[in-house]
Amino acid sequence: SRSMQFGSAGYTKSNYASTLAATLACFLMKQGDAVGLTTFGEKLEEHIPARNRPGHLRRLLTELEKPAVPGGTSLEVPVRQLADMLTKRGLIVFISDLLAPIETLDRQLGWLGAMGHDVVLFQVMDRAEIDFIFDKAAQFLDMESGDAWFVDPDQARDGYIRKFNAHREAARSSCE
C-alpha cells in the first residue's frame, strides 16, 4: 500500500517488509519448508506458489526487489483470491503496517483460520508513526487517499498516540 512507502530514516516500511520476507524465506527453506510469495494491492498482483527447489529462492528475492505497485490496498478481494489458490493447509504470513479497518482484518484472518491455515502477522511501523516525534506544525499527507491536513503536533500528539495504540492493540487481538 502507499502507506508502506513511508520512512523517516531513509528506509521505508516497504524496505523493511521485503527484508523480513527475504529473511523468513531463507530461514524456512534452509529447514526444508516450501515457501511461496503473494503480493497484492487492490487485487492480487503476483503469486509464486510454495516450493523448495534450486532457483526458487532467487525467484522470490527477485520479486521482493521489485517496487511496490502504486495504489491502495484491500484485504477482501486478494485474500479470497489467495485462498482459492491454496490447495493445502499451511502457514500464511502477512507483513504489513496493518493500517486497515480492524473489522476487515478480523474477518479475513478469521476466515483463513477457519479454512485450517495458521496465520501470522508482522506489523511493520516507522518509529515516527509510533512515537509521533514531529515537533513543528506541518502538512501531513494521507498516503492512501492523498488528503492533506495541517497539523500542530503538540496539540495532536496525545490523541494520535492513544488512537494509534488502540488500533495496534486491536490488530494484535485479531491474531488471537
How would you describe each model-predicted region?
Residues S1-R51, L91-S96, P101-W111, I130:
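An amphipathic, basic-hydrophobic helix/alpha-beta surface used to engage anionic
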Residues S3-G7, L64, P153, R157:
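A short, mixed-charge helix-start or loop-turn motif at secondary-structure junctions
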Residues T12, P70-T73, G159-R162:
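Short, surface-exposed alpha-helical recognition segments that flank or form part
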Residues H47-T62, E176:
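Short, electropositive alpha-helical surface patch
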Residues P54-L57, G72, R157, R168:
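Alpha-helix initiation and N-capping motif
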Residues H56-G90, I102-E103, M125-D126:
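Von Willebrand factor
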Residues D84-G90, I102-E176:
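Von Willebrand factor type A / integrin I
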